[in-house]
């Protein structure tokens, strides 16, 4: 037997947990070893809200999964709109080109954050992770017109207007 190359297998948090449980059930490892095989950061991902993996849904745009979790709410294009909606008991997703410290109150008020710019180290990503809120950044197909309070998905006829219900998945 010749081994040419080895590497650590990459897997989702759910897959790592499932594998550890099954290996323990089969007697291949102890319960203690099973617990040690699941990274605490991965376990944290499983504690955030998630969409049903078997559900039918249409993905209209993709970006970087900057902070785990799922969110559903009315699209809002300013921090102020997110705060007002939260005060009225409405759930929102804050949609911005990118966030700044001025958007913090809106980020706190919103269920999740969606940006067309930025990455995993952007303001939106770092703050959302710190708050435990879902965030998707760098959605290139999302062209935002904050003044008109709407966003278009490039390559489609989809236009998201303020108040439209949207969802985002910061886990996958």
What is each stretch, according to the model?
Residues 17-21, 32, 92, 126, ...:
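Predominant activation on well-ordered alpha-helical scaffold segments within soluble catalytic domains
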């Amino acid at each position: 037997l010749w081994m040419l190359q080895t590497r650590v297998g990459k897997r989702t948090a759910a897959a790592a947990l499932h594998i550890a449980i099954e290996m323990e059930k089969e007697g291949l490892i102890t319960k203690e070893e099973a617990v040690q095989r699941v990274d605490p950061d991965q376990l944290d991902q499983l504690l955030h809200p998630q969409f049903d993996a078997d559900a039918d849904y249409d993905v209209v745009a993709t970006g970087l999964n900057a902070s785990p979790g799922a969110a559903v709410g009315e699209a809002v294009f300013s921090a102020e709109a997110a705060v007002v909606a939260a005060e009225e008991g409405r759930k929102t997703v804050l949609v911005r080109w990118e966030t700044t410290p001025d958007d913090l109150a809106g980020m706190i008020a919103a269920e999740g954050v969606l940006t067309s710019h930025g990455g995993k180290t952007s303001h939106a990503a770092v703050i959302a992770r710190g708050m435990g809120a879902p965030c998707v950044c760098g959605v290139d197909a999302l062209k935002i017109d904050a003044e008109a309070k709407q966003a278009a998905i490039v390559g489609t006829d989809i236009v998201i207007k303020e108040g439209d219900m949207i969802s985002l998945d910061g886990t996958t």
